[in-house]
Amino acid sequence: SVVKSEDFSLPAYVDRRDHPLPEVAHVKLLSASQKALKENEKAAWSSLSMDEKVELYRIKFKESFAEMNRGSNEWKTVVGGAMFFIGFTALIIMWQKHYVYGPLPQTFDKEWVGKQTKRMLDMKVNPIQGLASKWDYEKNEWKK
């Protein structure tokens, strides 16, 4: 079977809010009832019923503005996919913390950090603008 490509130099039907009147009608090949309805269209529109007017509209347009403006439910898929990947990442991180990484080194203990800070103060590290400049050596406390 041969696939026939569409000739884009010819007018095409497009449903867009910024282009409300397409160049051609939505339905190109009319059935017998649609042809009869198109003949009735030439008469007074007051003689047509509401269903006939809607059918005429559907021949010309695929969607109304209300249908075009209706929101899609795609956001639910996007949020669901994002939550899935966030949850999967959390599971990987928990697995890594339990099985891959060892315990924290002793240098992260509060006691160790306090001893290291005291050692830096005793060595008077960066006495002009740094840590030692904020320490009162006479009172043995932080300056206020």
Swiss-Prot record:
Biological processes per GO annotation: mitochondrial electron transport, cytochrome c to oxygen
Subunit annotation: Component of the cytochrome c oxidase (complex IV, CIV), a multisubunit enzyme composed of 14 subunits. The complex is composed of a catalytic core of 3 subunits MT-CO1, MT-CO2 and MT-CO3, encoded in the mitochondrial DNA, and 11 supernumerary subunits COX4I, COX5A, COX5B, COX6A, COX6B, COX6C, COX7A, COX7B, COX7C, COX8 and NDUFA4, which are encoded in the nuclear genome.
Organism name: Hylobates agilis (Agile gibbon)
Protein name listed in UniProt: Cytochrome c oxidase subunit 4 isoform 1, mitochondrial
Pfam families: COX4
Record-stated family: Belongs to the cytochrome c oxidase IV family.
Topology of this chain in the membrane: Single-pass membrane protein
GO cellular component, as recorded: mitochondrial inner membrane; respiratory chain complex IV
Subcellular location: Mitochondrion inner membrane
Residues modified to N6-acetyllysine: 4, 28, 35, 42
Residue ranges crossing the lipid bilayer per the database entry: 74-99
Membrane-side (Mitochondrial intermembrane) residue stretches: 100-144
